[in-house]
Amino acid sequence: YYVQAAEQLGDKTPADAEEVINTLKTLDFNTIDTVAIMYDATDYLLGNPMYNDDNPTDPTQFTGNLEASLDVLQSLYPQIRIIVMSPTYAYAIDEDGNYVSSDIYIYNGRDVLSTYVIKECYSSNLHSVSFMDNLYGSITEDNAKEYLTDNLHLNVKGRKLIAKRFEYFLNYYSKGYASQE
């Protein structure tokens, strides 16, 4: 699957893809309880296409890549809990280099960042996996300056916020965890 995805992505294959693939190959997924998948807003900022209605598992598309990954994980390891984590807020950059709202700025002719998150949530629901909304649930347009180093990347405080939220999300249904707040 990895090789096929890289072939379809061609020159859009990330530089560290081989390292990631080799790392994944060393894991024994039969010993793993939970897999967390988190996308940032890079696909949106690059204007990458989001979905292909004719091929919902097209790995060259934002949701197609997610759908294909969920299909593979669920078919090979049905015992694993999967948590899909949405991107946090990211500023779009306009033609003049200014940070602008990603809720109004369209890169590829049809989609704003929140549409990516909605599609990601929809894919998660189709596969009956957990979905953790970071766009509206943690780092938002209102507080992004406090948690980002630039328009996209989390600072230490932002990483800690997401880690704390993930820990809570991961353990919420564990016996007594929610009552420890």
Please name every model-derived segment.
Residues Y1-P56:
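Conserved SGNH/GDSL esterase-like catalytic core that processes O-acyl groups on lipids
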Residues D33-M38, R81-S86, H127-S130:
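Structural recognition of the beta-strand scaffold that forms the well-ordered cores
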Residues V35-I37, L70, I82, C121, ...:
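Hydrophobic beta-strand residues in large extracellular and virion-surface proteins
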Residues N48-N65, S101-G109:
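Active-site cleft segment of glycoside hydrolase catalytic domains centered on the general acid/base Glu
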Residues L66-L70, S114:
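Generic structural signal for well-ordered alpha-helices
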Residues L73:
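Hydrophobic pocket-lining residues that define ligand/cofactor binding sites across diverse proteins
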Residues P87-E181:
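Catalytic His-Asp segment of secreted/periplasmic serine-dependent ester chemistry enzymes
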